[in-house]
Amino acid sequence: MDVFSEVLSPTAAGIIEVVVPPDSNVIGQSIKELALRQSYGATVLAVFRIDQVIDRDLPEFVVQAGDTLVLHARWKNIAPIAENKDFAVVTDFPRDDT
């Protein structure tokens, strides 16, 4: 089945880490409220907070400064996330410079 072939292709999509900076407007919002899938086509896989890995009940999880969101997204959708001051993309990703 080719339905997921593009989104699962490592040349088209991948996993990135995004840190929530201390001055972010998303602090205090739940993962669901962030609407990352609707806005960027990104899926939150887990959240790292200090020494915890949160991977359950993610829609209700409330974001704090310093949280690291682990996302899966198409590479072309990551550039807009990187341009958003509410997030700091800390993973290198392929950029389309055309």
Give the location of each predicted region.
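Cytosolic regulatory regions of ion transport systems
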Residues: 1-98
